[in-house]
Each structure stands twice: as structure tokens, then as C-alpha cells.
Design a protein with these regions (language model features):
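Cyclophilin-like peptidyl-prolyl cis-trans isomerases
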Residues: 1-157
Length: 157
């Protein structure tokens, strides 16, 4: 279980599906263990769609030191997870193997993303916190006016 503890004390708990996307799951968990996400923000928020975080630059252009293979149908991988409310998936650039550290949590269903992004788990607790994040005021490029900070991200056994 992955726990995202927000700076306001709110908690989001995520169950990872290693069978659906093993490379993605391992990469995400390794970044969590390294403390990579601690202090980073949800830098892109689109209500009725998703909240996106995991960029050390905080502007959508950053990532970790490595990219991983995209585990989704358009890249030749059978990933059964659909992009429904509460699902966590990897953000990427146009290159199907460009996912790194940026992820997004679905605020609403988005079937057009199925087969295009590596979904790898779902929120099991804290969708109310996701709803609160989705409701914050945003400005240019859907960036929150006030930073939405992940204080700590860790694995709960």
C-alpha cells in the first residue's frame, strides 16, 4: 500500500497492481522508497479529469533519472486496468517509453486514456482528498495557484 500524506494532513492510500504493470509498479515503489516524491507537488489539476504530480521541476517537464517501458496496449502490452475514477497511471511524453516519475490519479473516468498510458493501481482510501485537490484554484497550464504539496509518500505494509 502506498500512502500519500499531504501537507494539510490529508491521506491518499493506493493499492498497486503488480500483475497489470510490473515494471511500472516496481519503478514507482522504488521512487517511493528513495523518498523521491517527498515534498513534490500536484502540479497539474483538471477537475473532472485528473490530478498530476511527481515532477521535481513542478512544471510538467521533469522526471527521475530513468525512463521505463510503457505497459499499455498501444505499446504492445496487455494492461487490463481501465482509466476510471481513482485509478493511478503514469504520465508520459509522446514517446511510449518516456514514463519516469510523473503520475496522475483519475478524478473521473477517461476511457480515451485506456491503452495509451500505464495504469498500475487505484485509490482505496482518500478519494475525498483527491476531490479536494481537484477543487483547488488553478492558473496557467492547470497549475494550482497555491502549491498542493505531498509532504511524504511511503509504503505501508
Amino acid at each position: 500500500m502506498i500512502v500519500i500524506e499531504m501537507d494539510n494532513g490529508r491521506i491518499i492510500k493506493i493499492e498497486i497492481d503488480h500483475d497489470a504493470a510490473p515494471i511500472t509498479a516496481e519503478n514507482f515503489e522504488n521512487l517511493v522508497k528513495e523518498g523521491f516524491y517527498d515534498g513534490l507537488t500536484f502540479h497539474r489539476i483538471i477537475p473532472g479529469f485528473m490530478i498530476q504530480g511527481g515532477d521535481p521541476k513542478g512544471n510538467g517537464t521533469g522526471g527521475s533519472s530513468k525512463n521505463i517501458k510503457g505497459e499499455f496496449a498501444a505499446n504492445g502490452y496487455n494492461n487490463p486496468i481501465r482509466h476510471t475514477r481513482g485509478v493511478i497511471s503514469m504520465a508520459r511524453a509522446m514517446d511510449p517509453d518516456s514514463a519516469s516519475s510523473q503520475f496522475f490519479i483519475m478524478h473521473a473516468d477517461a476511457p480515451h486514456l485506456d491503452g495509451q498510458h500505464a495504469a498500475f493501481g487505484h485509490v482505496v482510501e482518500g478519494m475525498d482528498a483527491v476531490d479536494e485537490i481537484a477543487a483547488v484554484r488553478t492558473g496557467f497550464n492547470d497549475k494550482p495557484v497555491t502549491p498542493v504539496v505531498m509532504k511524504r509518500v511511503y509504503i505501508e505494509e
